[in-house]
Amino acid sequence: WNKGVSILHFLGGNSVELSASGTRAISQTKMTITQRGLVDGFECDVVCTGRFYDFMEKREGRWGVVLRQPIYEKDRINPLDPSANFKLDQDLLLSFPEGYRHLAYIQTKLGFKVKEDMPQLKGAAVEGLYQRGRDWLNHA
């Protein structure tokens, strides 16, 4: 809280793909991340939508999440005051991946180090994740 971190994760619809053995699964859950914070003196909300891509396994009769990987699809930033003369540093903004660039922008402005190789809607990172998911299901 002292660094201006006010974040909420909202979970939406879910789909599950089971392995042939019935002991492993890939679960995808729609999610929205909202973060409020100060950016260059303006209070702003960032909204980022995506999915949680979960590797799940049944062990000793109970299901659990083995790995959760977010996939960032798109985001936006809005000043709380719609009349604010609000300008983002375009060089900084465009240095971040498209799927979560506004979320990365506010977090960087708040002093956090942001990973820049996270899976997005398209690209090598998400294709690699999907392949890992197929391998997970096929080697159950």
Task: Briefly describe each language-model feature range.
Residues L11-V16, R51-E57, P70-I71:
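Hydrophobic/aromatic beta-strand elements that line small-molecule binding cavities or substrate pockets
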Residues D40, R62-A140:
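Terminal "cap-and-tail" regions of soluble proteins that handle hydrophobic small molecules
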Residues M31-G37, M56-K58:
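Beta-strand elements of well-folded, non-transmembrane domains
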Residues R24-I26, E57, R62-G64:
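General beta-strand recognition
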